[in-house]
Regions:
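Core dinuclear metal-dependent hydrolase active-site scaffold
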Residues: 89-169, 247, 255-326, 411-421
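Metal-dependent catalytic neighborhoods of phosphoester/phosphodiester hydrolases
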Residues: 184-197, 215-225, 343-347, 385-391
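Amphipathic alpha-helical segments
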Residues: 27-49
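Binuclear metal-ion centers of metallo-dependent hydrolases, dominated by the metallo-beta-lactamase
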Residues: 204, 210-268, 284-285, 367-421
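Structural recognition of the beta-strand scaffold that forms the well-ordered cores
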Residues: 130, 138-142, 171-177, 203-208, ...
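Compositionally biased P/S/T/G-rich terminal and signal peptide-adjacent segments
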Residues: 1-24, 84, 90-92
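Active-site environment of divalent metal-dependent phosphoester hydrolases
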Residues: 125, 147-148, 179-185, 212-215, ...
Length: 421
């Protein structure tokens, strides 16, 4: 049914999930990519979406007959192409919305409880971001661990800011970057518990995690998860339990791919990197499989979400995206501002300074392009953010930093930042 690119160097097939698979090609020209797109049309697949980000090209084609979709990406700077064939699922709309009385768009970094590592007396993990859009609805990004304080911090914030929207309950789109417990644990509890879930209306859940077949040794194959095993213990169980909760809650699920555009209330969300782009480079850690996306609000102000992105992901961004894409007003500091979990000594980084593990070139790039607000999902008192390490970070990322000791809210019109009480 589907022809594939015949020229260029092809990697082994990559089993993603849900009967989905990917071919990755190097040495592909734009003409060869165009020929492949034509072959999809010749096979009577219908075009659902096309997108360009800088010099990169993306397309989604669907076959109702076979219940399949084909997502294709071409990265011009590196002459690489990705072909992903998967079951036909939810397809996002990129259309804007007429809103008569738009609300001021905001972006909040919530103060949350964190896991304490008794060995070094530091607190690690967890992040929750909440964007409120012109229509009053919310986009939540990730979640903290399954602590009561985190649950009430999130639900109370949503309910307090739902006033005046006209909605009976907060309207939520929930996007996840990767499957570590400090990013999905709280969400899993809310989704699985009717009492908590009924306090909000979940319109869409969006994620793209590794397949179990691709987990590798870095997934601790134990039966416990979330807070019972620490931040990262039992990641395999964590993802399985999260996906079971997603299925049980009955919400619409969207498996995004790079180049996809999801528009909600005139906020444009572009997915820039997934684990499908990093392949065939090996995943040394779950963080290396995470997603990066950019939110451009109706005001034109933008937010770059890095999750726990590693230096490999940072290099992919620098190698494949132009200045217009990387120019943002607000950035989420990757991996809670801490050092990388990647095997930097096996990569091309200078390991003499731990901060180099996070590719300071990316932070310098966004700073040079005018980024003015840095949201760091960690406590300012953590010693791993202090001293020369903190100085090194600030020398590259020169924006004003805000930590989640308190809940900070960014006005996405003026970029003014205020504490939420």
């Amino acid at each position: 049914m589907f022809k594939f690119i015949t020229k260029g160097k092809k990697s082994n097939i990559y089993s993603i999930s849900d009967d989905s698979y990917e071919y990755s090609y190097t040495g592909v020209t734009k003409a060869e990519y165009d020929n492949y797109i034509q072959s999809l049309k010749d096979n009577e697949l219908s075009q659902y979406a096309v997108n360009t980000i800088g010099a990169n090209h993306y397309a989604t084609y669907v076959s109702e007959k076979y219940g399949k979709q084909v997502n294709v990406a071409y990265y011009a700077n590196t002459n690489t192409a990705k072909v992903i064939v998967s079951k036909l699922g939810y397809l996002p709309s990129s259309e804007g919305t007429q809103i008569n009385s738009p609300k001021t768009e905001t972006l909040a970094q919530l103060a949350i409880n964190k896991i304490k590592n008794e060995a070094d007396n530091k607190y690690y993990g967890g992040m929750i971001y909440v964007a409120q859009l012109q229509d009053g609805s919310f986009v939540i990004i990730d979640s903290g661990e399954r602590f009561e304080e985190n649950r009430e911090a999130l639900l109370s914030y949503l309910e307090a800011n739902n006033s005046g929207t006209g909605f009976a309950k907060p309207q939520v789109t929930w996007i996840f970057t990767h499957g570590h417990a400090d990013h999905v644990g709280l969400a899993r509890e809310i989704l699985a518990t009717e009492e908590y879930r009924n306090r909000i209306d979940i319109n869409l859940i969006a994620y793209n995690f590794l397949n179990e077949d691709t987990y590798g040794d870095f997934y601790w194959d134990i039966d416990t998860d979330d807070t019972t095993a620490g931040v990262h213990g039992g990641a395999k169980s964590t993802i399985a339990n999260f996906e079971a909760a997603v299925e049980a809650c009955g919400a619409t699920v969207y498996k995004y791919h790079s180049g996809d555009v999801l528009t909600i209330a005139n906020c444009k969300i572009e997915f820039l990197v997934t684990h499908e782009d990093i392949y065939p480079y090996p995943f040394f850690d779950v963080n290396g499989s995470g997603t990066v996306f950019k939110m451009t609000f109706a005001t034109g102000k933008s937010f770059l979400v890095l999750g726990d992105a590693t230096e490999v992901t940072a290099d992919f961004l620098l190698d494949n995206y132009d200045d217009d894409t990387l120019a943002v007003d607000v950035i989420q500091v990757a991996h809670h501002g801490t050092s990388s979990n990647e095997k930097a000594d096996e990569y091309k980084n200078d390991t003499t300074n731990v901060f180099n593990n996070y590719r300071p070139q990316l932070y310098k790039k966004v700073s040079d392009l005018g980024c003015s607000v840095a949201l760091c999902p960690n406590l300012s008192t953590n010693t791993n953010l202090g001293g020369s390490y903190n100085t090194a970070m600030n020398s590259y990322l020169t924006a004003t930093w805000y930590f989640h000791d308190d809940t900070y809210v960014v006005n996405m019109s003026t970029l003014a930042v205020a504490k939420f009480n």
